[in-house]
A protein has these predicted regions:
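Exported/periplasmic ABC-transporter solute-binding proteins
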Residues: 1-3, 8-32, 38-184
Length: 184
């Protein structure tokens, strides 16, 4: 059994509701958005508005994302985005579907896709590609993460204290987490 668990805010809330973690002990870790990775050397088109996002997606020669059936949040969100933009058929014709968002980013980094969809924290600092940007409203999806001790004891206290340290905050910032998750 782990001393501490770090999962999405939604999962922490379920664990608290089930009595597996104490709600008052939950600490927000940060938030990450869903966005696009662009392969190094590929055009960096703007995606700050729905029209710009649509144009960038249509202009890309290939795009990788997590198959929505795998349960990946970014993949499910992207399926809704391309449906709403009216370009689902065009995107599926040039899709490289993978199981997880990080695999989409890795495929982009290897040159197997011009763009990739994933959580921004899975894009930042990946070789061969970089973050083009987060999806604009109304397509933005932000996921919060939180930590909670699963058991009482010195190890759990030490881990929770470390998670609250300036060094860990700097490391989380460096990989794209925005400060403060919800504390369900």
């Amino acid at each position: 059994r782990p001393a501490v668990i770090i999962v999405s805010d939604a999962a922490i809330a379920q664990l608290a509701e089930a009595g597996l973690v104490r709600r008052e002990a939950v600490v927000g870790i940060g938030r990450t958005g869903t966005g696009l990775a662009v392969r190094d050397g590929a055009p960096r088109r703007p995606i700050g508005t729905p029209d710009q996002l649509k144009a960038a997606l249509l202009a890309a020669g290939s795009i990788a994302w997590a198959d929505a059936s795998s349960g990946a949040n970014a993949g499910r969100n992207f399926e809704g985005v391309i449906e709403a933009l009216g370009i689902a058929a065009e995107m599926r014709a040039k899709a490289k579907l993978v199981r997880f968002g990080v695999e989409a980013v890795e495929a982009c980094g290897r040159g197997e896709a011009e763009l990739a969809v994933s959580q921004t924290t899975e894009i930042v600092n990946r070789p061969g590609c970089s973050l083009l940007g987060e999806f604009p409203a109304p397509f933005a999806l932000s996921t919060g993460y939180a930590a909670a001790p699963v058991e009482a004891g010195e190890l759990a206290r030490a881990v929770m204290a470390r998670l609250a340290s300036a060094e860990v905050r700097a490391a989380l910032d460096a990989i794209g987490f925005r400060s403060g998750g919800d504390t369900p």
